[in-house]
Design a protein with these regions (language model features):
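Conserved CoA-thioester-binding segment of acyl-CoA-metabolizing enzymes
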Residues: 14-73, 107
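Crotonase-fold acyl-CoA enzyme core
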Residues: 107-222, 245, 250-254, 259-262, ...
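Short C-terminal tail/terminal secondary-structure segment
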Residues: 233, 269-272
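Intrinsically disordered, low-complexity segments enriched in serine/proline and basic residues
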Residues: 1-5, 9-13
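Glycine- (often His-adjacent) and acidic-residue-rich active-site loop
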Residues: 72-108, 124, 154
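Hydrophobic alpha-helical membrane-association signature
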Residues: 48-51, 98-101, 131, 244
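Short, charged, surface-exposed hinge/linker loops at domain edges
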Residues: 229-235
């Protein structure tokens, strides 16, 4: 039996020269995709998610690309979903938003037949945490940290966090850090097995080294190995993403959530 993610999604192809929220470069068989919305702490909006999905689709089809690295521009990996866009943009349900954006992105990363590295150069929160956890490997800068984030605005975990996080660090720790919203340091994440390696001043060189090693490896075997791991560990990924959407739909209607968002935008502590 082989796990196949069945969700159908639409990808709108964008030429690399037209990308507004990503920077793209190649090196020794690796494609480096840099989240580039510095004015918004590299938070995700519809445009960035579409551009990232398009870039991954192109990388999958390009025989010259044998490994993909996702990182953040500047000192931040990503603050997660751009809350301002959700407040000001098209009025769709949270469930529909996930089905259009993060769910297909997470499934695409896991089903991609090439290794994907999250090079976590700085703070990583919310949906971006889910994106990083979906990648095959995580390399963190020593000053980076992870924040589950969702409970701060009275939401349930989404973007696969409810599935990935307990698998990496156990259910008790996952619930503790969801409830408390405390940061997980790079050092702690390494000790718990949530990240594979941590680099200080040598972070960039470490990422290049690991990406180069993967790019020079057996491509077809790596693709088969990833399928095997998906089958063994993540057979319920698609169902988990769907269920997260159901829960988020309900959480998004609560007075607690409205208070959480208002407090976030006003930069004050919420009163739940």
């Amino acid at each position: 039996m082989t796990v196949t993610f069945k969700q159908r999604v639409t990808v709108i192809f964008i030429c690399e020269d037209e990308m507004k929220t990503l920077l793209s470069s190649t090196q020794a068989g690796s494609l480096i995709l840099t989240l580039n919305r510095p004015e918004r702490a590299n938070s995700f909006n519809f445009e960035m998610i579409n551009e990232l999905r398009n870039a991954l689709t192109a990388a999958e089809a390009d025989p010259q690309v044998r490994c993909v690295v996702i990182t953040g521009g500047g000192k931040v990996f990503s603050a997660g979903q751009d809350i301002t866009e959700m407040k000001q943009g098209e009025k769709i349900s949270y469930r529909e938003h996930l089905e259009r954006t993060y769910n297909p992105l997470i499934l695409q990363i896991r089903s991609m037949g090439k290794p994907v590295i999250a090079a976590v150069n700085g703070p990583c929160a919310g949906a971006a945490f889910g994106v990083a956890l979906a990648c095959d490997l995580r390399i963190a800068r020593s000053t980076a940290y992870f924040v589950v984030g969702f409970s701060g605005i009275a939401l349930a975990p989404d973007s696969g966090v409810s599935l990935f996080m307990p698998k990496y660090i156990g259910l008790g720790r996952a619930q503790e850090y969801y409830y408390s919203n405390k940061p997980i340091t790079a050092k702690q994440a390494l000790e718990w097995g949530m990240v594979n390696q941590v680099g200080g001043f040598n972070f960039d060189a470490l990422v290049r080294q690991v990406a180069g090693e993967l790019a020079s490896g057996p491509r077809e075997a790596f693709a088969a190995g990833k399928k095997a791991f998906n089958h063994a560990i993540l057979p319920n990924l698609e169902d988990s993403l769907r269920y997260e959407g159901i829960l988020q739909e309900e959480a998004g209607k609560t007075a607690e959530h409205h208070e959480g968002v208002s407090a976030f935008l006003a930069k004050r502590k919420p009163k739940f």
